Swiss-Prot record:
One of its GO terms (biological process) is cell division. Belongs to the EPSP synthase family. MurA subfamily. The active site is at D123 (proton donor). Pathway: Cell wall biogenesis; peptidoglycan biosynthesis. This is UDP-N-acetylglucosamine 1-carboxyvinyltransferase. It comes from the Bacteria. Cell wall formation. Adds enolpyruvyl to UDP-N-acetylglucosamine.
Length: 426
């Protein structure tokens, strides 16, 4: 039997929890190491399954990769030595196991002028096509087609261009950005993603010698350079993990201090928790959430940064399920994310969906049941729901959670949560 979590509800979460590096940042930073011959070092890397998977992808492209412990628990140092001529075929099994593997496309085009990248796997949260990635590469002078389950791209040379994205896609912004840093001339990306992870990537690329302006705005301007050099870079704190702990504190009427993250990256999320009745305080490297009473109902609508993150939608539904009043949650990014609601209904949630909307009428307490994770964030949301359910909830397919939450069980236990990992050895 595969591993599962046993979550017994009833305890408040109280204490302090440290957040490691951002999953949505570290994998792209690792891919960016392909852009420079030599050894790049990335610190504050989270201990999640996708990091060794990305290491396997890079090894398949000719890099030497080592992962060493940096601090007790959940942080590592990743060292990547990139050869003078990386391989350009990324069509082996590791590539298909997680979505972020596609971010090697841009660096391979920049260094090799050709790339064969297997279509990636990852979370089952709806359609995430590569159309914008391919369109951006074509504007830079490449051809790009889907052939035999792979993205196949080629170029004699890459030239700067003005590229307007139909939607501020994080992945498309990253791939076009990494291709453009070594292209000839100026590239302008209009309607670029503004996420902190994009800013983190831009900061690392600038340290490597790239010329980029506009990071954190909707217009990125890149002046191509002839070559980049290796660097050392520290990954930003994971705002999604940090917000998960904040929402968990609110759901359990707890008191949790979260460190290792820039609270400015979570301004809207923390405002929503304040609207739900939480007391929020800040310091230099984190925030504290104190929820004195049952949370009040709050409406949520997911949007690209600086809007409410789609990755936190399952946790928002979990909060709404036990809040006082009725909440509406609108999903504007990934249409299939509401399949999580079916599992919440197993736990007794009064919820219904209609297209991009979910209406949740809060009840004082959920009831335990066996539930199944469909993706990283849904899994975390189900664990949080189990913390406010009567009895013991079994959360299955927890390998999803391990892809995004380092030492999740241990950190919950440190805050007083009654959570146990079982199975896997039968």
């Amino acid at each position: 039997m595969s591993e599962r979590f046993l979550v017994t509800g009833g305890n408040r979460l109280v204490g302090e929890v440290a957040v490691g590096g951002a999953k949505n940042s570290v994998l792209k930073l690792m891919a960016a190491a392909l852009l420079a011959e030599g050894t790049t070092t990335i610190t504050n890397c989270p201990d999640i399954l996708d990091v060794p998977l990305m290491a396997e992808v890079l090894r398949g492209l000719g890099c030497e990769v080592t992962i060493t412990d940096d601090a007790p628990g959940d942080r590592s140092v990743v060292t990547i030595t990139t050869p003078a001529e990386p391989k350009y075929h990324a069509d082996f099994p590791a590539v298909t196991q997680f979505r972020a593997s596609v971010c090697v496309l841009g660096p391979l085009m920049a260094r090799c002028k050709r790339a064969v990248v297997a279509l990636p796997g990852g979370d089952a949260i709806g359609s995430r096509p590569l159309d914008m990635h391919q369109a951006g590469l074509r504007l830079l002078g490449a051809t790009s087609e889907i052939e035999h389950g792979c993205v196949v791209a080629r170029a004699e040379e890459l030239r700067g261009a003005r590229i307007r994205l139909d939607f501020p896609s994080v992945g498309a912004t990253e791939n076009i950005l990494m291709a453009a840093v070594l292209a000839e001339g100026e590239t302008v990306i209009d309607n670029a993603a503004r996420e902190p992870d994009i800013v983190d990537l831009c900061n690392m690329l600038v340290q490597m010698g790239a010329r980029i302006s506009g990071a954190g705005t909707s217009v990125l301007t890149i002046q191509g350079v002839e070559r980049l050099h290796p660097t050392e870079h520290r990954v930003i704190g994971d705002r999604i993990v940090a917000a998960t702990w904040g929402i968990a504190a609110a759901m359990t009427m707890g008191d949790v201090r979260v460190t290792g993250v820039n609270p400015k990256h979570l301004a809207l999320v923390l405002d929503k928790l304040r609207s739900a009745g939480a007391r929020i305080s800040f310091d230099v490297d984190g925030f504290r959430v104190v929820q004195p009473d049952r949370p009040r109902a709050v409406n949520f609508s997911t949007l690209p940064f600086p809007g409410f993150p789609t990755d936190l939608q399952p946790m928002a539904i979990g909060l709404a399920a036990i809040a006082d009043g009725t909440s509406m949650i609108t999903e504007n990014i990934f249409e299939a994310r509401f399949r999580f609601v079916e599992e919440m209904i197993r736990l007794g949630a009064d919820a219904r969906t209609d297209g991009h909307h979910a209406v949740v009428r809060g009840i004082p307490r959920l009831s335990s049941a066996p539930v199944w994770s469909s993706d990283i964030r849904a899994g975390a949301g189900l664990v949080l729901a189990g913390l406010v359910a009567d009895g013991t909830t079994e959360v299955h397919d927890v390998f999803h959670i391990d892809r995004g939450y380092p030492n999740f069980v241990e950190q919950l236990q440190s805050l007083g949560g009654l959570v146990e990992r079982v199975g896997g050895a039968e």
